[in-house]
């Protein structure tokens, strides 16, 4: 994989991880032990590996069957997801969050990683390198979740909704790039 291929994946991983960062930032304002912070971040990272992997496998299948239509659909999916993230971030704003434990942690991790399924679907259609992609998504999301939890425990409302909006805008940009390559 070339650096030219790796850089967009890293940027996309940061865009996806901004959702986990923003939510973790708010959650970090709840008193958490370091072990809880580590566990929450690792769970989010694992889900950011599993969800895009499933999406990429499905995306490759669709690409082999439907070719150009699948490419167009993948780009539209990224654009739609990006707009949805921006819209829902503005509409919902900040909400009170509590630290997830047990099953609620898995539901939480699933919720913040569902967008990575859609991105994985798009990347599968375009034939992105699976192992590198999912490991980048997982690692960066885990690190951003840890950062959000730690920063949230020290300061309030650093990024909040704006972090999610930036992530959504980046996804729209990548969708447009896939539709209209430079």
Swiss-Prot record:
InterPro entries: Mntp/YtaF, Put_MntP. The keyword rRNA processing does not apply. It is a multi-pass membrane protein. One of its GO terms (cellular component) is plasma membrane. It is found in: Cell membrane. Pfam families: Mntp. The chain crosses the membrane at residues 6-26, 37-57, 72-92, 101-121, 131-151, 162-182. The keyword Membrane applies. GO terms for molecular function: manganese ion transmembrane transporter activity. Keywords: Cell membrane, Ion transport, Manganese, Membrane, Transmembrane, Transmembrane helix, Transport. It comes from the Bacteria. Belongs to the MntP (TC 9.B.29) family. Probably functions as a manganese efflux pump. HAMAP family: MntP_pump. This is Putative manganese efflux pump MntP. It comes from Bacillus mycoides (strain KBAB4) (Bacillus weihenstephanensis).
């Amino acid at each position: 994989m070339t650096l030219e291929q790796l850089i967009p994946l890293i940027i996309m991983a940061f865009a996806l991880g901004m959702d986990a960062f923003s939510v973790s930032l708010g959650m970090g304002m709840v008193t958490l032990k370091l072990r809880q912070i580590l566990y929450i971040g690792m769970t989010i990272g694992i889900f950011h590996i599993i969800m895009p992997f499933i999406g990429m496998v499905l995306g490759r299948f669709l690409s082999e069957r439907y070719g150009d239509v699948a490419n167009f659909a993948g780009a539209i999916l990224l654009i739609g997801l990006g707009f949805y993230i921006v819209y829902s971030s503005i509409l919902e704003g900040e909400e009170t969050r509590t630290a997830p434990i047990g099953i609620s942690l898995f539901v939480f991790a699933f919720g913040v990683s569902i967008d990575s399924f859609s991105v994985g679907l798009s990347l599968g259609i375009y034939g992105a390198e699976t192992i590198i992609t999912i490991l980048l998504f997982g690692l960066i999301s885990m690190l951003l979740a840890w950062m959000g939890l730690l920063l949230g425990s020290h300061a309030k409302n650093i990024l909040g909704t704006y972090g999610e909006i930036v992530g959504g805008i980046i996804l729209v940009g990548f969708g447009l790039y896939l539709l209209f390559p430079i």
